[in-house]
């Protein structure tokens, strides 16, 4: 079964210059720009393409998508009487935009500058821990998403690498998702290939525009054509939410261990992933990518404490989620302890 959400995507160099056309298409006459605190100059450059439609700029987007930022953005939209908004950025700004759009039904255009892929999912959340609010709505999806590789060339390599591995996690888990289909399988494999190919080129030259385009294309494929996620996402999300580790880097750390654990139960998925990454041991290849990119390999490097492991096991074991290999609390403990230590995965 293949079901497509209605979402308009513009991909390619210079596509951001067409944002005025997109605003017109979606009947946005009073547009607010949403960005992070340090992206005011970028917002001004985008505003030039929107002309008189722009009624204001909100820099209320914050890392971690706190509830206070959500409230501030909603208030800004109301104060400006905006009938649409443009969100500039990656995971956190887009995440907040989705929650705001779901709550207000005000449409938005996403201008993507990282590889997180959040814009392709109708799931949203704000806050963390006991304060987290979450949901899923078609109104959380952007009316249009613009992927212009030129907007990613100034993203630092370390941030790019972590974001790409976050996207890689979407692709890998789609290869063994319970609702995968031939389209998802083919495009998830291609996503992994593009991402794996782009990273060493970006390390050599972060301004390599062809590598940037490959990474952005791979991230879009991984996010737009995905199956239900399993162990890797469950562990990474629970660790991030409960222990305050950074989102993309947490996904990058956990992915090789989840892939290695699931490999015996998902041989076809591992065959596809091996083709994409050019290795006989794809889980080790994922680990080696983290090492080559200078990313953390262990959760201990991200601020998690060894004393946190039992709680992490408890919260993961308490959730129901699909996974190709059966999971016991002992198995989850093994995965998390290996991911904490950061040595090459061994199962």
Residue ranges and their predicted role:
Residues 1-83, 299:
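ATP/NTP phosphate-donor binding region
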Residues 7, 102-186, 191, 272:
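A glycine/threonine-rich phosphate-anchoring loop and its flanking beta-alpha core
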Residues 16-19, 39-43, 67, 92-99, ...:
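Short glycine/serine/threonine-rich phosphate/pyrophosphate-binding segments
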Residues 77-115:
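A short, small-residue-rich loop immediately preceding and capping a beta-strand
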Residues 168-172, 215-223, 255-258, 286, ...:
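Short alpha-helical scaffolding segments that buttress acidic/His motifs in well-ordered protein cores
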Residues 178-285:
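Active-site segments that bind and position negatively charged phosphate/pyrophosphate groups
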Residues 276-347:
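C-terminal charged capping/lid subdomain of soluble metabolic enzymes
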